[in-house]
Design a protein with these regions (language model features):
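Residue-level recognition of the GNAT/N-acetyltransferase active site
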Residues: 86, 91, 124
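Glycine-rich phosphate/pyrophosphate-binding loop shared by adenosine-nucleotide-utilizing enzymes
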Residues: 3, 53-57, 83
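Helix-loop element at the rim of GNAT/NAT acetyltransferase active sites that forms part
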Residues: 18-31
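Conserved beta-hairpin
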Residues: 44-58, 62
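Conserved acyl-donor/pantetheine-binding loop and adjacent beta-alpha core of acyl/acetyltransferases
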Residues: 59-87
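A short beta-loop-alpha structural element at the N-terminal edge
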Residues: 2-16
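Conserved GNAT acetyl-CoA-binding A-motif
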Residues: 111-124
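Conserved acetyl-CoA-binding loop-helix of GNAT-fold acetyltransferases
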Residues: 90, 96-109
Length: 124
């Protein structure tokens, strides 16, 4: 089993849309334009690969994103530096194997390297 987390590419986006669709209602539906917009604005947009297949992704935004979310705006009004986790999705057939923890650990490592003091999110 070969597993790695790496920055997503534009070629990953269609598969990421399918994973996102499978995760509804835990996340909201996205179309191609919306995922492309997130891809361009995200500070952290990484995919989880298992045996040459994308099985998950995590998207985090920083301050200054053009993003129509009252939850994101709440953090932006209060903090100069933060990462806002927009969504984390793991393929249902691979949930419960610690992949979410791996993503959060990688995001914490990223935040530490960039000296970003807080990671925020909305909880459904």
């Amino acid at each position: 089993m070969f597993c790695k987390i790496q920055p997503s590419t534009e070629t990953d986006l269609l598969h990421i849309l399918e994973l996102n669709k499978a995760a509804i209602p835990a996340v909201n539906l996205l179309n191609e334009m919306e995922i492309q917009n997130l891809f361009l604005q995200a500070v952290y947009f990484h995919s989880l690969w298992l045996n040459q297949e994308v099985i998950g992704f995590l998207i985090a935004l920083g301050p200054g994103a053009i993003y129509n979310s009252p939850n994101y705006r709440w953090f932006e009004l209060r903090y100069d530096q933060f990462l806002y986790i927009d969504r984390i999705v793991i393929d249902p057939s691979h949930q419960g194997n610690g992949f979410g923890h791996m993503f959060y650990d990688k995001l914490k490592e990223f935040a530490g390297q960039k000296k970003i003091p807080r990671i925020t999110c909305e909880v459904n």
